[in-house]
Amino acid sequence: MMQEESSSPVSPVDSLSNSEEELDKQQSKRGCRKRRSARKSPEDPDSPISVKRNKKASSTGSSPQSFEELQSQRVMANVRERQRTQSLNEAFSSLRKIIPTLPSDKLSKIQTLKLASRYIDFLCQVLQSDELDSKMASCSYVAHERLSYAFSVWRMEGAWSMSASH
């Protein structure tokens, strides 16, 4: 058997003698979640875990990866994660520009999402109401300013604080 088949999140070269309990202990020390036993039997080839391991074992060959290869993979994973985080932050920045906010608002990501959801609900209410005529519903700058003002008033009246707790 190959050493790769029992890859642990702690060390890529753990021996096969590590039991699942030992792996769980190692994961709990690192703050990781326990793995679920998704397989019905260890021989089940349709298991997501065994498919992943088979793919990994076949791509690396019979020798364990060198330290340099592992370090290179880690660096690449860090680069991908940094790019993903940067992309996510840029998306939140764009969302914050779209949502009408008060000058004093410094919104966290979760607050931004909740406020965006409330703003969408508010816009749906505006569209469904007969209060606005067709001229005001156009996408002009004045209409946008009026909607922003109406949303700010709506927030200040307490509708935001009541609905944000959901």
From Swiss-Prot:
Give the main localization category: nucleus
Q: Compositional bias (Basic residues) spans?
A: 28-39
- Enumerate the InterPro entries for this protein: bHLH_dom (IPR011598), E-box_TF_Regulators (IPR050283), HLH_DNA-bd_sf (IPR036638), TWIST1_bHLH (IPR047093)
Protein name, entry field: Twist-related protein
Q: Which gene encodes it?
A: twist1
Q: Which domain of life is it from?
A: Eukaryota
Q: Which PROSITE patterns match?
A: BHLH (PS50888)
Subcellular location per UniProt equals:
Nucleus
Origin organism is Xenopus laevis
- Output compositional bias ranges, type Low complexity: 1-18
Q: Which GO terms describe its cellular component?
A: nucleus
